[in-house]
């Protein structure tokens, strides 16, 4: 069994800095779980604790049926794939892949069979005699994977293995890693900063912020039902739009007012929203909750707002409309952290709130034009302005 069980894990460095606090995750046998979060959130630290490269300050980590807190890395029966490939430059591809097997003093014919099988799986059989310097980035990554595969470990630990590749190759390698996992069915714990990687590759995704686990669930559930404002803003590209909205109940219908805009809401969460009567909440609207009024299905997109297009991005398959509303932007620690991670500064907005809407690519809207955008109320999200938790 390759199950990884992390129970209340914590990490405090000798200088008193806390990197992780009370993290509990179970990666089931054969499951692919992705740790995702901003730089410095503790995801790599957690991976290194599982690998045995970092001491566990608090809690317990088990691999298979064995607690490994005091077990040396070499005895944990795991294989790690690093961001920089960590190949020996003076060795051939074959020798790089065979190195750990030779250390274990396996018979020569068994080593040869394992290396050839892994090379065939990764489609690098013709590269076995080459040195790493003669390989492309994608080929080096396959060799690094092959070196892990030949060990037949209980689990793979992968630390941002695709981050050094260019965008096109990253997409290709994402698909190949997914297919490889389907073939091998080896328990995998994967760390990435890229939420697109996390969503496309993971059976489940664990979102970490400031050393604490925010939510772990399937990609669909993480996206559709985020537990707090940080998860909602961090997952999704472009990010969710946030705006302060005032709640008012009228004839059993919730009215959400932001600036001079009103949205009527009568979906399943209305009872919870009633407790915020005449108070402000944080309203979350994903870009796809908008549509050009001309193309919108009235049954779904029942509400509308008038906007002036400040920027139009036409990507072929989608178009993105950027617009502003004269409303003070939502300023919470979580949102500022997300913007900082994206390289943006909330202070440049002043008293305006920026929105991005995804609309039908056949729309004829133009920059500077005033248009009607329809909104699907069933796709709205609501957050407590104090705690940041979902309402």
PLM features: what roles do these ranges have?
Residues 36-38:
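The feature captures the beta-strand-to-loop junction immediately N-terminal to the Walker
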Residues 250-391:
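Non-catalytic connector elements of ABC transporters
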Residues 73-234:
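ABC ATPase nucleotide-binding domains
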Residues 60-62, 66, 212:
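ATP-binding/catalytic-site motifs of ATP-hydrolyzing domains
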Residues 51:
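Helix-to-loop junction immediately C-terminal to a conserved catalytic motif
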Residues 16-18:
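Short coil-to-beta microelement around the adenine-binding A-loop and adjacent beta1/P-loop entry
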Residues 5, 26, 62, 372-374:
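ABC ATPase nucleotide-binding domain
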């Amino acid at each position: 069994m390759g199950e990884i069980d992390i129970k209340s894990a914590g990490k405090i460095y000798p200088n008193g800095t806390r990197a992780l606090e009370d993290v509990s995750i179970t990666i089931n046998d054969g499951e692919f779980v992705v740790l995702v979060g901003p730089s410095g959130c503790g995801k790599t630290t957690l991976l290194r604790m599982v690998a045995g490269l970092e001491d566990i300050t608090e809690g317990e980590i088990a691999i298979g049926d064995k607690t490994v807190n005091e077990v040396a890395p070499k005895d944990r029966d795991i294989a790690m794939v690093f961001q920089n490939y960590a190949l020996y430059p003076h060795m051939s591809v074959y020798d790089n892949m065979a190195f750990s097997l030779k250390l274990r003093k396996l018979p020569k014919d068994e080593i040869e069979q394992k290396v050839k099988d892994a090379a065939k799986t990764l489609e690098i059989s013709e590269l076995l005699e080459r040195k790493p310097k003669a390989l492309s980035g994608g080929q080096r990554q396959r060799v690094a994977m092959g070196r892990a595969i030949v060990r037949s470990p209980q689990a793979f630990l992968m630390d941002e293995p695709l981050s050094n590749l260019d965008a096109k190759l990253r997409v290709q390698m994402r698909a190949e890693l997914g297919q490889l996992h389907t073939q091998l069915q080896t328990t995998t714990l994967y760390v990435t900063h890229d939420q697109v990687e996390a969503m496309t590759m993971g059976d489940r995704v664990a979102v970490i912020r400031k050393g604490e686990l925010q939510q772990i669930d399937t990609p669909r559930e993480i996206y559709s039902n985020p537990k707090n404002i940080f998860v909602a803003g961090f997952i999704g590209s472009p990010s969710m739009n946030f705006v302060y909205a005032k709640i008012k109940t009228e004839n059993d219908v919730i009215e959400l007012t932001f600036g001079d805009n009103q949205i009527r809401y009568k979906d399943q969460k209305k009872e919870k929203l009633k407790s915020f009567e005449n108070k402000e909440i944080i309203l979350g609207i994903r870009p796809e909750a908008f549509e050009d009024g001309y193309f919108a299905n009235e049954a779904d997109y029942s509400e509308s707002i008038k906007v002036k297009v400040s920027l139009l991005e036409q990507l072929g398959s989608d178009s993105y409309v950027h617009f502003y509303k004269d409303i003070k932007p939502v300023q919470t620690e979580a949102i500022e952290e997300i913007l900082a991670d994206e390289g943006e500064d909330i202070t440049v907005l002043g008293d305006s709130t920026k929105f991005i809407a995804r609309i039908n690519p056949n729309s004829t809207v133009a920059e500077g034009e005033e248009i009607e955008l329809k909104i699907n109320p069933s796709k709205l999200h609501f957050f407590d302005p104090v705690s940041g938790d979902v309402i």
